[in-house]
UniProtKB/Swiss-Prot annotation:
Signal peptide annotation: 1-26
Name of the gene: LYPD4
InterPro entries named in the record: Fert-Immune_med_protein, LY6_UPA_recep-like, Snake_toxin-like_sf
Name of the featured protein: Ly6/PLAUR domain-containing protein 4
Entry keyword annotation includes Signal: yes
PANTHER family: CD177 ANTIGEN (PTHR16529:SF8)
Glycan attachment sites: N117
Boundaries of every UPAR/Ly6 domain copy: 142-223
Primary subcellular site in the record, as a coarse category: membrane
SUPFAM superfamilies according to UniProt: Snake toxin-like
Provenance organism: Bos taurus
Keyword annotations of the record: Cell membrane, Glycoprotein, GPI-anchor, Lipoprotein, Membrane, Repeat, Signal
Propeptide: 226-246
Length: 246
C-alpha cells in the first residue's frame, strides 16, 4: 500500500485540531509573592501584578493566598506562578477555624493567558463575613504575635491578649512557607483550642510547602517590659529560628 497523501482541507483540519490542544503552547502566568505582617488591612490590601513568566508545557497558572489571624495580629502570605497541578476552580476555606487562632486560604489553578490575576482579599472577606463572631472571652490570656522574629515579633513587640472561651490553650510555633520566590519564616503565637500542630494536616497549601516546629516557651517570658531575650528559653527559641531559616 502506497503512502497516503492528505488533501489541503484535511491538512487544515489536522493543523486546527493540533493548535487547539491545551498542551500545544506554553502559558504566560503572573509571578508574585506576598509576605505581610504589619498594618494588615483586608480591605486595603492589594496584590500588584508586576511580573509574568512563561510556564513549562502542561503547566497552569496558580494563585494561593493564606490569611492568618491570632487575636489582633494578622498575616498575609501568597504565591503566584506556574503549577503542574490539574486545573481547579477557586477554593476558599478555613484550614483552622475560629475561635482563637485561625487560618484561611484561597487557591486555584487555571489554564488561560494570565488568568491568575487576583489582586484583593474579597474571597477571604466573604468567608469571614459568613463565620459566626466569638463574643465570649475567658479569664485566660496568651502571648500573641504573627510575624518574623527579627521584625514584628521581637520579644518587646509580643503582647498578651485575652482568649475566647473555647480557645484557652497558649500556642507557639515557628512556620516556614516556601514556593517559588516565597521563602518566609515566621512566629505564630496566640490562643488555640489545642496544643497540637495547626499545620499537621497541611504540608502543602496549593504549591506552598509548609514546615512547622512547635515552640516550648514560657508565657512568663512575655509579660511586662522585662528583658526576655536574656532568658535561656528565649535564647533556645532564637537559636531554633536561625537554624530553621538556614
Amino acid at each position: 500500500m502506497g503512502p497516503q497523501h492528505l488533501s489541503p482541507m484535511q491538512l487544515l483540519c489536522l493543523l486546527g485540531a493540533i493548535s487547539s490542544l491545551p498542551w500545544a503552547e506554553a502559558l504566560l502566568c503572573y509571578e508574585a509573592t506576598s509576605s505581610l505582617f504589619r498594618a494588615v488591612g483586608l480591605h486595603r490590601w492589594q496584590w500588584f501584578l508586576l511580573r509574568s513568566m512563561v510556564c513549562k508545557l502542561n503547566e497552569g497558572c496558580e494563585e494561593t493566598l493564606v490569611f492568618i489571624e491570632a487575636g489582633t495580629r494578622k498575616g498575609i502570605l501568597g504565591f503566584k506562578g506556574c503549577s503542574p497541578a490539574s486545573s481547579y476552580p477557586p477554593q476558599v476555606s478555613y484550614l483552622v477555624s475560629p475561635p482563637g487562632l485561625s487560618i484561611a486560604s484561597y487557591s486555584r489553578v487555571c489554564r488561560t493567558y494570565l488568568c491568575n490575576n487576583l489582586t484583593n482579599m474579597n474571597a477571604i472577606l466573604h468567608l469571614k463575613a459568613r463565620t459566626p463572631k466569638t463574643l465570649k472571652s475567658s479569664s485566660h490570656s496568651c502571648p500573641t504575635c504573627v510575624g518574623e522574629h527579627s521584625k514584628s515579633c521581637l520579644p518587646n513587640f509580643v503582647s498578651s491578649e485575652s482568649c475566647p472561651r473555647d480557645a484557652t490553650k497558649c500556642y507557639s510555633s515557628t512556620v516556614k512557607f516556601q514556593a517559588g520566590f516565597l521563602n518566609t519564616t515566621f512566629l505564630l503565637m496566640g490562643c488555640a483550642r489545642e496544643h497540637t500542630s495547626v499545620f499537621a494536616h497541611f504540608h502543602h497549601i496549593g504549591s506552598i510547602r509548609v514546615t512547622e516546629v512547635i515552640n516550648i516557651v514560657e508565657k512568663a517570658l512575655f509579660t511586662g517590659a522585662g528583658t526576655p531575650c536574656r532568658s535561656p528559653s528565649w535564647g533556645i527559641l532564637l537559636g531554633l529560628l536561625f537554624a530553621f531559616k538556614g
